[in-house]
Curated annotation (Swiss-Prot):
Record key words, sorted: DNA damage, DNA repair, DNA-binding, Glycosidase, Hydrolase, Lyase, Metal-binding, Multifunctional enzyme, Zinc, Zinc-finger
Family affiliation: Belongs to the FPG family.
Regions crossing the membrane: none
Active site: 2 (schiff-base intermediate with dna), 3 (proton donor), 57 (proton donor), 259 (proton donor)
UniProt protein name: Formamidopyrimidine-DNA glycosylase
Taxonomy of the source species: Bacteria, Pseudomonadati, Pseudomonadota, Gammaproteobacteria, Pasteurellales
InterPro entries from the UniProt entry: DNA_glyclase/AP_lyase_DNA-bd (IPR015886), DNA_glyclase_Znf_dom_DNA_BS (IPR015887), Formamido-pyr_DNA_Glyclase (IPR020629), FPG_cat (IPR012319), MutM-like_N-ter (IPR035937), Ribosomal_uS13-like_H2TH (IPR010979), Znf_DNA_glyclase/AP_lyase (IPR000214), Znf_FPG/IleRS (IPR010663)
GO terms (BP aspect): base-excision repair
Recorded name of the encoding gene: mutM
Functional summary from the UniProt entry: Involved in base excision repair of DNA damaged by oxidation or by mutagenic agents. Acts as a DNA glycosylase that recognizes and removes damaged bases. Has a preference for oxidized purines, such as 7,8-dihydro-8-oxoguanine (8-oxoG). Has AP (apurinic/apyrimidinic) lyase activity and introduces nicks in the DNA strand. Cleaves the DNA backbone by beta-delta elimination to generate a single-strand break at the site of the removed base with both 3'- and 5'-phosphates.
Matches recorded under HAMAP family: Fapy_DNA_glycosyl
Residues binding DNA, per UniProt: 90, 109, 150
Length: 270
């Protein structure tokens, strides 16, 4: 699943081809995604794009006619291609621009979304989202206070979007390994020092992943078709039974919250 660094990479990749240009039309080939594509998007004709931003894993396109909100789902991706680029299977959605380019959304599983709102502050999917992990709001004081209320596994806690957005499964595994924390550790048992280390490492790992263009494991590619290169630096994720890069102990895998969790039983003692 594309996580925060992949969405940030997508944002940076598509912005030069969209910001300041005019949407000629929006083509919806299959409206039945995770949520049905907003009908308002089919009315977009000659609408200027003012800006592009991101909230959690949502891509937000600011226009003269409200906000287009995209989510890549489990396997979705967007590309910038010429108007005459052949349509492939699973190409469900195009934003056709006046510069000879279009943004094309491809999603085999159709777990993504393309929605519209005229008021971001009242957009229902944003109501319960926690702070951005790379913002100043997300700091050790905040995380320590938040953890006091949680009896859940630490990995589940970090992946809770009401706590902090954008720390998905891949990066949660890597962050906990770098901090030497077991993924099943109870969140409210974190010390202040451990919380400080967690916040520092979350910011470090996500920033590095963004610089590397995200992580390509199966479906994610950058908007220009290149893979993300952070996968080459993964220390534990997907490395079950391989030697720990620190101590040589075999990496173990367990299921936490229906997701595979990878850890070193020596470096990350419970």
């Amino acid at each position: 699943m594309p996580e925060l660094p992949e969405v940030e990479t997508t944002l940076k990749g598509v912005s030069p081809y969209l910001k300041g240009f005019i949407i000629e039309k929006i083509v919806v080939r299959n409206p039945k995604l995770r949520w049905e594509v907003s009908k308002e998007l089919s009315t977009f004709k000659h609408v200027k794009i003012l800006n592009l931003t991101r909230r959690a894993k949502y891509l937000i396109i600011h226009t003269e006619q409200g906000y287009i909100i995209g989510h890549l789902g489990m396997s979705g991706s967007v590309r910038i291609v010429p108007h005459d680029n052949p349509v492939n299977k699973h190409d469900h959605f195009d934003i056709v621009m006046n510069n000879g380019k279009l943004l094309r959304y491809n999603d085999a599983r159709r777990f993504g979304a393309w929605l519209w709102t005229n008021n971001l502050s009242e957009f229902h999917l944003f109501f319960k989202l926690g702070p951005e992990p790379l913002s100043e709001t997300f700091n050790s004081t905040y995380l320590f206070k938040k953890s006091r209320q949680k009896s859940t596994a630490l990995k589940t806690f970090l992946m809770d979007n009401s706590v902090v957005v954008g720390v998905g499964n891949i990066y949660a595994n890597e962050i906990l390994f770098l901090c030497g924390l077991h993924p099943q550790k109870i969140a409210k048992t974190l010390t202040k020092k451990q919380t400080e280390q967690l916040v520092f490492t979350i910011k470090q790992v996500l920033n590095e992943a963004i610089e590397q263009g995200g992580t390509t494991l199966k479906d994610f590619l950058q908007p220009d078709g290149r893979p993300g290169y952070f996968a080459q630096k993964l220390l534990v994720y997907g490395n079950k039974d391989k030697p720990c890069p620190r101590c040589g102990t075999k990496i173990k895998s367990i299921i936490i919250g229906q997701r595979n969790s990878f850890f070193c039983p020596q470096c990350q003692k419970k």
